[in-house]
Structures are given as structure tokens and as C-alpha cells.
Design a protein with these regions (language model features):
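Histidine- and/or cysteine-centered catalytic micro-motif in compact active-site loops
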Residues: 116, 168, 177-179
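Structural detector of well-ordered beta-strand residues that form the stable sheet scaffold
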Residues: 5, 30-32, 62, 112, ...
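Beta-strand-loop-alpha-helix segment that lines the small-molecule cofactor/substrate pocket
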Residues: 1-38, 53
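Secondary-structure transition into beta-strands, especially the periplasmic turns and strand N-termini
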Residues: 105-107, 168-173
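Active-site beta-strand termini and strand-to-loop segments that position acidic
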Residues: 158, 163-170
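Predominantly a Rossmann-like dinucleotide-binding segment in NAD(P)-dependent oxidoreductases
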Residues: 37-153
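Glycine-rich phosphate/pyrophosphate-binding beta-alpha loops
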Residues: 94, 172-179
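Short, well-ordered coil/turn segments that N-cap beta-strands
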Residues: 2, 29-30, 57-59, 169-171
Length: 179
């Protein structure tokens, strides 16, 4: 019965998510998933503007997340493997997609997506960083992406993704994640 704040993602598999939701429902436990971007001032202001009607009715939403400097760390540790992290769509896009849903006041009911490993598969400098803390290997000056060093020995998740979504309200949305 104690309320639970759970950092996203809810789980990394549908089975895991179903188990968490079922348990919360069966026990009457309040569950809040930590989608923290909706609490950022700029996002709250966007929602206020939309709700005020000043820009008319939302018909489409477009979001391009240029992962850029700093996003590389997802390819230097356990995030780089599908087994442990399932990829950037779950780890990073979850924030952006939550904001898109929140701004549209609607959820996705149709989606088509594709992604590929197109950038970091070209970097040959690999290292096992599992014994290090992130601060020991993170460097904000690693740019461009192909200059990266010490990437995880195994990278089997996409580094580029695109999605098209149709929301319950009829809003069409597109999302792109690139480096």
C-alpha cells in the first residue's frame, strides 16, 4: 500500500511492465513513473500555451532528439547491449515521447518505427569499462561521434531511430533520434 516512485523505464520487457502494473493494481498501490521532463519549466510553459488555445488545436508534433555529446556514454557501458538496456528508444526517447503525449493530451495507438546501428559500429576502439565508474571514462569533449574511444566491446542496439505515431486524438507525431 505504500506509494511507489519508479524511475523510467517501467521495465525493459512487456512481461516485466505487465508484472509491475498488475502488482500495483492488485495491491492498490499508487505508482508514479519518473518522467521528469514534463516538470521542466519550458515543457510546462509549452503545455500552458497549448491549453490556452493561443496557437490553435494541435494537429501534429515533431521531435528530433540530436543525442550528440554526452549521448555517447550509452555505448560505453551496459546500455550498449540489448540484453541489459534494450536501446536508446527505451532509455532516452521515453522522456521525449512522454512529453509528446503530455503536450497532445493523448496517447499513441498506432506506431511504425525503424532503427539501425549506423554510427558507433564504425568505432573500433573498444574497452571493458564495467569495473569503472562513469566519471572515470566520461569525457564531454568526444566529438564528433566517430572520434570516440573505449566503447563497450559489444554494441548490439540501434544508435539511429525514427518513429511515426498516430495518437488516439488524431494527432500525428514523428520522432527521430540521431547522433
Amino acid at each position: 500500500g505504500v506509494a511507489v516512485y519508479l524511475e523510467k523505464p517501467l521495465a525493459i520487457t512487456m512481461e516485466g511492465a505487465t508484472r509491475v502494473l498488475r502488482t500495483a493494481y492488485e495491491t492498490g498501490t499508487k505508482l508514479y513513473v519518473g518522467h521528469n521532463m514534463r516538470h521542466m519549466n519550458v515543457v510546462r510553459e509549452m503545455r500552458n500555451i497549448i491549453r490556452s488555445g493561443r496557437i490553435g488545436e494541435v494537429k501534429t508534433i515533431w521531435c528530433r532528439h540530436f543525442v550528440g555529446t554526452g549521448g555517447d556514454f550509452y555505448f560505453k557501458d551496459w546500455h550498449a547491449t540489448r540484453e541489459h538496456g534494450t536501446g536508446l528508444l527505451l532509455q532516452k526517447a521515453a522522456h521525449d515521447i512522454d512529453v509528446m503525449h503530455w503536450l497532445a493530451d493523448s496517447h499513441t495507438n498506432d506506431v511504425v518505427a525503424m532503427g539501425d546501428l549506423m554510427v558507433y559500429n564504425q568505432v573500433t576502439d573498444r574497452a571493458d569499462n564495467s569495473h569503472l565508474l562513469m566519471g572515470d571514462w566520461f569525457d564531454n569533449n568526444n566529438w564528433p561521434p566517430l572520434s570516440q574511444k573505449g566503447l563497450n566491446p559489444v554494441i548490439d542496439v540501434e544508435d539511429v531511430s525514427m518513429m511515426l505515431m498516430r495518437m488516439e486524438s488524431g494527432v500525428l507525431a514523428s520522432y527521430e533520434q540521431c547522433h
